[in-house]
Amino acid sequence: MSDNVPTIAAVATAPGRGGVGVIRISGKNLLPMAQALCGKTPKPRTATYADFTDTDGQAIDSGLLLFFAAPASFTGEDVIELQGHGGPVVMDMLLNRCLELGARLAEPGEFTKRAFLNDKLDLAQAEGVADLIDASSRSAARLALRSLKGDFSRRIHGLVEDLITLRMLVEATLDFPEEDIDFLEAADARGKLDGLRRAVDDVLANAQQGAILREGLNVVLVGAPNVGKSSLLNALAGDEVAIVTDIAGTTRDAVRERILIDGVPVHIVDTAGLRETDDVVERIGIERSRKAVSEADVALVLVDPREGLNEKTRAILDALPPELKRIEIHSKSDLHAHAAGGFGTGAETVIALSAKTGDGLDALKRTLLREAGWQGESEGLFLARTRHVNALKAAQEELSLAALCGNHQIELFAEHLRLAQVACGEITGEFTADDLLGVIFSRFCIGK
C-alpha cells in the first residue's frame, strides 16, 4: 500500500451498551497517538492499563490499550485497540478523541481490506471474516472459520500452481515450432490436464455445497386464495408469522420468513394471492410477490384436493417461470383424502400435508434439502459464495475447451490454461477488479 494511507478508527464492538467496548485504530507510526491517548509508551503485544485522556488531559475513561506493531498485526500496519467501558457515550467520546488526533472514520470493511492489500489475507479469507460474523447456523460458522483459516484458499492455490506448471510446460514447446514433434503427447500434457479437470470438479462440488449452506434456498408459496399458504408458512416457521383467516386476500403483502433445515437457510415467501385486484395496497403486495417468484429456486404449489386445478390455480401456474422447480402440496390432508397422482402442476414431487397436525412437514423439509442440492456437511467442506462457484465454473469451461484442442493447436491450448488460471485467481484476489473489491468490502460491518 502507499505510504500516504490515512490512519483509520472505528468502534469494533456492536452498537448499544455492554461491559466492554473496543475502539480499533490502524495506520502508520501510531506510537505518538498511543502516547497522546494514555500518556504512556506501550510495549508491542502487551496490555497497558491507563486512563484515556482528552486534549486537556482530563480522563475520558480507563481501560486497556493494546499496541500491535507493523507488520505483526491484523492489517499489517500499526494497530491500537482501546478496551474501555461499553457505553455508547464513552465510545463516542473515545472515537472523537482519535479523530482529533488525526484519524478518520473507517469505512465498512476497511480494516479487513487493508489486511488483504497488505497480503495478510487473500480475498477468500477476507470474505470468510464477514461470513463468520454473519453465520446463521453452527454449520455455517464452522465452515466460515475453515475459509478464514485458509482451507478454501489452499485448494485454489493448489489449482493455480498446477495450472502454472502445465502452462510452463506447454508454452515452452512454442519455442520449437519447426520441430515435427507432438509436444502435448510427449509431455503427457493431456494426462496432466485430465488430472487438473478432476481437481477443479472436486473443488467446484465442495464450493457448491458451501454456497448452499451460506446462501440457502429461496422458496415461494403459491396457490389460490385460502388454500393454506399462510398456515403452511406458520407451520414451517414454528410461529404465527402470517395472519390466517377464512377471508380471501388476507395476505395483502409478501410475508418473508427464514428457517433452518439441518443448518441450511431456507428463505420462504408467502405470496399475496397472484390475482387481479382493484385494491391499491393489495396490488403493491402482489407485485412484490411476482418479484419474489422471479427470484425463487423452488415453488410450493398448494392445491386443495377437493377442487383440484381450478381456474385461479391455473392462472397462477401460468404466471410462474416455466423453468422454476415445483413441489405440489395437497393441503389440509387431515380433512380429506390425498390425490396420489397429482393434478398436472408440472411438479415432480407431490406431498400430502396438514399444517394443522404437522403430517407431511418432515417429508417436505427433506424434499427442500434435496432440491437445494444439499448433501450434508462433510470433511473438507468450506463456506463459499456464488461468485466462487461462477469462477470455478469458468475455469472448468476453459479446461474443457483446452481438452478439445488438436495436437498442433498449442497456442490455443495455452490460452485456455491462462484463462482458467485467471478465473481461479479471481477467487483469492490475484486477478480482481477494484470495483469488485469495493462491493465485497462495503458489505462488511464498520470496525472490521
UniProtKB/Swiss-Prot annotation:
Give the matching InterPro entries. G_TrmE (IPR031168), GTP-bd (IPR006073), GTP-bd_TrmE_N (IPR018948), GTPase_MnmE (IPR004520), MnmE_dom2 (IPR027368), MnmE_helical (IPR025867), P-loop_NTPase (IPR027417), Small_GTP-bd (IPR005225)
Which residues are Mg(2+)-binding? 230, 251
Q: Where does K(+) bind?
A: 226, 245, 247, 250
Q: How is the cofactor bound?
A: Binds 1 potassium ion per subunit.
Tell me which residues bind (6S)-5-formyl-5,6,7,8-tetrahydrofolate. 24, 81, 120, 448
Reported function: Exhibits a very high intrinsic GTPase hydrolysis rate. Involved in the addition of a carboxymethylaminomethyl (cmnm) group at the wobble position (U34) of certain tRNAs, forming tRNA-cmnm(5)s(2)U34.
| Protein name per the record | tRNA modification GTPase MnmE
What lineage does UniProt assign to this protein's organism?
Bacteria, Pseudomonadati, Pseudomonadota, Betaproteobacteria, Neisseriales
